[in-house]
């Protein structure tokens, strides 16, 4: 069952806007993961990486409520990061182009799976879960503040 907060956010901004937002968030995630890889996996501030991963997870969950983390054979360290970047870049290219397709859903599931593997490699699963919750709550707060008591936009 999809989190009602995600549905609220999607309804507020619309699918077309959130598809563009996904491309943007994937770009930011790719930059952070790229820095992590270039740093030889010694990046001291994992919070930046996890924050960008959370943004991607949130928008994927909005656009693809039926997406689940598909089981993946567990590759090693840098390989997970590389595969995550590859799948995310492919998803961004699809989202920026043609309308929704089943292949797009498959890539969304792969991205979620590789995010899960990557955050486990970072040993930061709780940080990701907390970041997702905080970011969703913050967005809902913005929506509520922008609407009057009658539910209309201000």
Sequence positions of predicted segments:
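Flexible "arm" and connector segments at domain edges
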Residues: 1-154
């Amino acid at each position: 069952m999809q989190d009602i907060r995600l549905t609220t956010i999607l309804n507020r901004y619309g699918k077309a806007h959130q598809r563009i937002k996904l491309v943007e968030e994937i770009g930011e995630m790719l930059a952070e993961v790229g820095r992590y890889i270039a740093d030889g996996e010694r990046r001291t501030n994992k919070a930046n990486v996890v924050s960008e991963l959370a943004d991607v997870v949130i928008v994927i969950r909005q656009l693809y409520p039926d997406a689940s983390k598909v089981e993946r054979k567990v590759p090693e360290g840098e390989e997970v990061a590389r595969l995550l970047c590859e799948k995310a870049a492919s998803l961004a290219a699809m989202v920026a182009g043609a309308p929704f397709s089943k292949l797009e859903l498959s890539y969304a599931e792969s991205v979620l799976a590789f995010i899960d593997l990557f955050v486990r490699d970072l040993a930061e699963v709780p940080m990701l879960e907390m970041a997702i919750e905080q970011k969703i709550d913050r967005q809902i707060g913005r929506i509520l503040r922008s609407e009057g008591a009658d539910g209309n936009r201000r």
